């Protein structure tokens, strides 16, 4: 057990604060201290793994996510995070397989559909990636980055009207967030697609 008056809550709070500041190695130490209080804490395991990804320690991240999955095999977050680790490794088949396992548990998870789409796109399975992005958008259509990723896949298919539509939607979402430079960029891409 950690000493110095630390509690699980204090360790988690400190770890999250450090991670937000980009101090991932120090955050990892605090997550490890949190896990001394509760070795099966899913939040700590998942966040520990994400911190490992940010500093390029994918093997350690996958280990943390595997522990989370072993503890709670019906919680989709471990699968989503493990898929992210595989994506950052370039292990796209593995990322797709893990995303599929997670989707069996949470078929309406936009997050898992996006990870699947990214894996398929990287495997150059463009139509399958388009289908997966469209599934993600069924459950959460508020992220302009997903619309832009879809637009890139549609661009590879030279489906210009659909490319323009996706970029225009992304532009509108950026505009709502006050991200005018991103909105303008999306509008330019939409206009280019409309002229193709």
Indicate where each model-derived feature is located.
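TPR/TPR-like (Sel1-like) alpha-helical repeat modules
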Residues: 138, 155-178, 188-191
């Amino acid at each position: 057990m950690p000493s110095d008056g630390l509690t699980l809550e204090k360790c988690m709070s400190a770890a999250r604060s450090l991670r937000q500041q980009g101090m991932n190695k120090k955050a990892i130490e605090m997550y490890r201290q949190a896990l001394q209080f509760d070795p099966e804490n899913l939040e700590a395991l998942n966040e520990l793994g994400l911190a490992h990804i940010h500093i390029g320690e994918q093997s350690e991240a996958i280990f943390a996510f595997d522990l989370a999955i072993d503890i709670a095999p019906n919680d989709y977050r471990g699968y989503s995070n493990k898929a992210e680790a595989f994506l950052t490794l370039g292990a796209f088949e593995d990322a797709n397989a893990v995303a599929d396992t997670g989707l069996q548990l949470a078929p309406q998870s936009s997050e898992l559909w996006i990870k699947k789409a990214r894996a398929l796109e990287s495997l150059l399975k463009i139509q399958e990636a388009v289908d997966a992005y469209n599934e993600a958008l069924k459950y959460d259509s508020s992220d302009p980055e997903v619309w832009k990723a879809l637009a890139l896949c549609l661009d590879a298919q030279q489906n210009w009207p659909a490319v323009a539509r996706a970029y225009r939607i992304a532009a509108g979402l950026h505009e709502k967030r006050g991200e005018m430079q991103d909105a303008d960029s999306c509008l330019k891409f939409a206009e280019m697609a409309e002229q193709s």
